[in-house]
Amino acid sequence: MTLDIDEERTRSAIVEDLDVAMRPVVSPLIPVRVVVVALFVVMVVAATPALLSHRSGTTPPFGPARNGRIAWAIDGDIMVGDPITGATTALIDGPGIVRNPVYSLDGSRLAFLRQVPTDQSRFDIFVSAADGGSPVMVTAVPVPMPAALEWTPDSNALLVNDADGRIFRHSIHGSAGRLVVDAVHLEPSASRPPDGAELLYERDGDPGALYVMARDGSRPRQLIGPAAQQCSCTLAGPARWSPDGKAIAFAIRLDAAETRTFVMAADGSGLHRLTDDTGAWIENDPTWAPTGDRIAFDRWQRDDAGDWQIRPIGIVPASGGHAEPIGVAPAAEGALIEWSPDGRSILSLPKTVIDGYTTYPNGTGSVAKPVIIDIDDGASTQFDWSVGSVASWQRRAP
C-alpha cells in the first residue's frame, strides 16, 4: 500500500541509522508547516473512524495469542512475511522513507516512522490498520530520532523515547504529545502488564541501575543499584516484565568475566539468579515466553584460550535451572529474540540490524535473513527474506 499523506517537506535525504538501504523519494514542496499543524486535527478526526474500524478488540495484549504476520523495514519500505508460507508483501511502499514497524499489542494496528526528507534526524510517527490501510500521522511536529517506539497495553497510545532521552506519550487519536519525563531510557516493552500502570527505565545519570515509575512519570523508585540492593549489582542489558507483570528478568554483571540472568519480583524483592550453569558465561537480553513459563536469552562461553564464543540461544524455566540450547548459534554479536505469539517458536535476527549505518546511495547497511526456531525440537528454518530492521510479530485473537 502506498503511503499518501500530504506534508510540506521535500522528500530527498541522506539516510543513516535505524534501518538499512533506504532510498530517498522526491516529491513536490507543498504547504508550509503552519498549514499542516492547523489542519492536523481535522486530518486525524477524519481518518480516525476508518482506522478504529480495523480493531478486533479481542486479542489480549499479553499472554499467548495466535500467530499473525511478521513486519520489518527494508529499502525505505515496510514488508510483511507469512511465517507459514514464506510469502512476502510490501505493506507500506512510499512515498518517502518509512522504517521501524511495530504492531500494537492487540494486533489491530501498525505504528511506523517516516523520515523528514529535509532533516534525516527527525521523524513523523504514523499509525495504520494492521494491513497498512488508513494511515494517520499522529505527530503534528516531527520528533528527534527515536531510541524507542512502544505501544501502551490498550493500543491507544505510543511511548516515544527520543534521542535526547525524553519520553513522550502520543495518543493515536490526535491530541498533542505529552512529555512524561526526560534524561531516561525506556526498557523494551516498558509498560507493566496488564494495564501499563508502571514503566521500567534507566537514568542517564545513573548507569547500571534499573528504575520503575508510574506511567505519568511520578513515584520513581530504584530496583537495581546501591539504593535498592545490598550488593554490587550492575545492570548489564535490557530488563523485561513477565507477561503477568509480577516479575522482571534482566542481566547483572557479576565481574569482568561473568554476566548472568537474574529475576526478581515486581516490587524489587526476591532477587535471585535464574541459571545454574557452571563455568564462565555471559548471559544477556532475557525475553519471556508469552506463556510466562520460560525465558530465552543470548549467551557466550569463554573457551580455553580465554576468547568468548557465541552459543545457541538458551532457554530456561522461569522457576530457574539449567539452560537448554535451542537451534543453531546466532551470529557473534548475538540474536534479537522475538517469541512467536503462541510461544511455540522464536524469531532470531542478528543484532547488526539495529546498528546499520547507511548514506544513500553508497551505503550497504546490514541486511539479515531471519531464522525461526521450533521450541519443541530445535529445528531452525531460515527464511529468504531481506530484513533491515527489528521485526515485529503480529498478535491475533486465539
Q: Regions from the language model: what does each represent?
A:
Residues M1-I5:
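Short alpha-helical interface segments
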